A protein has these predicted regions:
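Long, well-ordered early-domain segments
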Residues: 53-85, 89
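Hydrophobic/aromatic-lined pockets within catalytic cores
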Residues: 24-25, 76-80, 113, 134
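Surface-exposed patches in mature extracellular/periplasmic domains of secreted proteins
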Residues: 3-6, 80-90, 140-142
Length: 180
């Protein structure tokens, strides 16, 4: 595991992938005690029912998935993607969530964030994991702000690529260039 350069996860798999990326292989055996053996669902419910969180949940800008991200933040030591990039000996992390508007995957990657003119480095790892793990109806969707049009679009959306998969990717990428 010490030779792994990239770890990725989607849905529940993103929880352990992010743990490995933030803490490395030496601490991986502790994951069972720190997460798997905890009644995370009950802890999340108790956390949601705290008076301050009940008030926050009434806000249109704060949802149940934000509470999940807050609870996961302690598991990852409040790490951001920028923190991960600066660590030596830890693998890169790729978390994939679902773009509900397109029905496709949304990668928490520099390339994807470049498309929406946003900065992945400042995003908490827990936020990406919550976005990936959010089960519709049980947890609220996580919304990212699209700043398209406020930066130069990346080269990937040019017309130079011809193969089928690349055309599909290019069309998906172009959809992010419209911030409306």
């Amino acid at each position: 595991l010490d030779k792994v350069d990239l770890v990725g996860g989607v849905s529940g798999g993103s929880i352990v992938a992010a743990y490995f990326a933030t803490h490395g292989s030496a601490r991986l055996p502790r994951f069972e005690r720190e997460y798997l053996r905890q009644d995370f669902q009950e802890n999340l419910l108790s956390y949601a029912l705290r008076p301050g969180n009940l008030v926050a949940l009434s806000s249109p800008w704060f949802g149940r998935s934000h509470l999940l991200a807050e609870r996961l933040d302690s598991l990852y030591g409040a790490a951001t993607f920028g923190d991960l990039a600066s660590r030596k000996g830890h693998p890169d992390l790729l978390i994939t969530a679902t773009d509900m508007s397109l029905g496709t995957g949304f990668e928490f990657s520099k390339a994807q964030f470049d498309l929406i003119c946003s900065n992945l480095q400042s995003v908490p790892v827990s936020f990406a994991v919550a976005a990936s793990s959010s089960v519709p109806l049980l947890l609220s969707p996580v919304t990212l702000r699209n700043f398209a049009g406020q930066c130069e679009p990346p080269e990937v959306v040019g017309d130079a690529w011809e193969d089928y998969r690349t055309r599909l990717y290019r069309e998906q990428a172009r959809s992010y260039l419209d911030s409306n």
